[in-house]
Amino acid sequence: MDCLFCKIIAGDIPCKKVYENEQVLAFRDINPQAPVHVLLIPKKHMKNILECDGETIAAIQKAIVKVAELEGVAADGFRIVSNCGENGRQSVHHLHFHLLGGARLTEKMA
């Protein structure tokens, strides 16, 4: 499989890890759009949210809470974004969520 995020999970491509558990990996975005910009991905490959099962989405939700706390954005707020499909502008076809925060974000959907 030629998936960028699967290669990161396998350790073939380095990342700046923020958090990891059995099901989810969270790491810093290489092109941050906010002072805090972390990607959260399931370790099991799935193309997008349409392929995600309940157990995986629950694990991602718990990881989002943990990362928001670790990054110090839980109290003041943050944004979660997941693009799905071509019209949703999904660029990497492995389910992922962007956690953005660390400053007052613009109204523009990032």
Where are these regions (language model features)?
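HIT superfamily nucleotide-processing domains
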Residues: 1-110
